[in-house]
Amino acid sequence: MLSTGGDLTYLNASTSFETGRWYHVVGTYNGSRMRIYNNGTERGSNTSRRGSIDYSPATFVIGCYLDDNEFYPLEGFISEVRLYNRALSSQQVRNRYNRTRGRHTTRPKPPVVVTNRELSAGPYLAFTSPSEALVRWETAKPMPTRLAYGMTPTLQNRINQQERKRSHEVILPGIEPGAIYHYSVGIEKDGQTQWLEPATGESDFNYSRPDISAIESPYAQDERMRKSSAAAEAILAATGIRKGYALDYGCGEGRLAFALASRTELTVIGVTDDAGEATRARAALRRAGIYGTRVTIQHRPLAKLGHTDNLYNLAVSSELLHNGELPGDRVELLRVLRPSGGVLALDGLPQSGLAKLITGSPLVLGTTTEVSGELLLAKRKPLDGAGEWTHTYGTAAQTANSGDEIVNGSKMALQWFGKPGARGMIDRQGRNPPPLTSNGFLYVQGDNRIWGQDAFNGTILWNYEFPSELRRVNTPRDGSNMCADDSSLFVAMRDRAYRFDGKTGRLLRSFPVISNEAANWGYIANDDGLLFGGSVKPGSEYTKFKGTPYWYDSTGTQDTAKVCSDNLFAIDRQTGRKQW
């Protein structure tokens, strides 16, 4: 592609690009004609440009498409690059190809002989630690399976699973940052291993935090540290909260904050109004090597934190634990606690004393309480009047209305900013499915990947890398492949719909499309305990999005043709039984 001013002109070869093969590719421009050559033969030309090339001041990049917010790398290797200050003739290109042909051997890769329809779920990839990834898939009946994988499409590594089972998972070790991992599932069929369509996962989207459980404590193992460690264990066991943001309200010298951070992926903010305590806490946590990354200590008045509303997944108090007093202001504690499940975990007094801390305060109306051992847990209720956006156009009825009764245009403020960002997304012109939100969860679909996030603070709770079959674009003429309820996300991919737990991402169930012939799952919605679907002909979905031909903003048939279902059905979303 090039420009002589204004828009870019793209030149495509008339031959298809296949991974696992070497190509000699040449592009030339002589001031009036663009040409592209493949293996010594001209495969395309364009005369729409005249004059000198308009060189951009941006970085010159080979091997990918890169701009301010997009990155599409080549799937393969580049052996050699040559740049000329003149346009080569067709004969010169052919001569150059003849001198280099045969220099490279094509690397073998597993043959693709069956499609992913042979699976009852997956495959999909999740990063479980900074150095490991997990690939999951399910088969309709128990069978041994294999996984071929590697950092190139040649899939040079093999993992065999001899056990006959339906649910399969394989750990990929040695994950490196900034790498693309290719993998393919092999299933036993007719006495042979048959390989499925390869998929990829990018470690740029590995958000796993390092395990810091083995770091040496910067605190003496005195009674206060032992009490803090025991309290952290009890709080985590009772709440199950291991990701997000935690507040230590009256944090003392940071012992409880350290104990929580070292056992979880939480980011812990400790606040104290004592300058000496803040200084000692920071010094200790710096010695441990986690200050500023996992724990931060703030010296400020407890009655006026200055933190945004509805932020924290967990709130505790070292001051209460060790001295029997809950400092600060109950109104402020409730204000910063995350709605729909944020937990204030109280410890340090008998249950009767802990209950008095709640009685007569705003915490009574804003939370529900329960006893767990020596703890009193106050869980914040959902926001009264809060809306949700569970389908592409708001609701299953496509009302384009969230039902929110809280928003006031004169009082809006930034809640959070951060990941996932633009890197893993499809460009806006492709019009892929929009984010959904319900009950404090936010679901974002990118290019063959989905993130599950905390809607109140942006924490990435889980994310999956999917095969290219997930992609759905031009939704005004096709439709989204996602919908949500108050606890889960439904995703249509290929011939199935998947239900993932909103908090953990765990696969709860997969639902096969209902059709009398081969079909993909098209329309998807849920309401009143039912999951609705429509079957479409395989391959009828819009999936292409790279380049101006796929901005879907023209009035031609390519952009405006509607994808229609062949049928409509309803399934009980709990049991999976067809209702009609």
Where are these regions (language model features)?
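Extracellular glycan-associated modules
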Residues: 1-110
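Repeat-blade elements of multi-bladed beta-propeller folds
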Residues: 59, 427-450, 473-498, 515-568
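Short, surface-exposed linear motifs at loops/turns and structural transition points
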Residues: 109-208
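Conserved class I S-adenosyl-L-methionine
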Residues: 241-258, 267-269
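A short acidic, Gly/Pro-enriched loop at the edge of an enzyme's catalytic core
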Residues: 303-314
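A short glycine-rich, Lys/Arg-flanked "PGG" loop and its adjoining helix->strand segment in the class I
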Residues: 325-342
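Beta-strand-rich domains and repeat architectures in extracellular enzymes and scaffolds
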Residues: 394-403, 407-449, 480
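Short loop/turn segments that connect beta-strands within beta-propeller blades
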Residues: 455-457, 501-505, 572-575
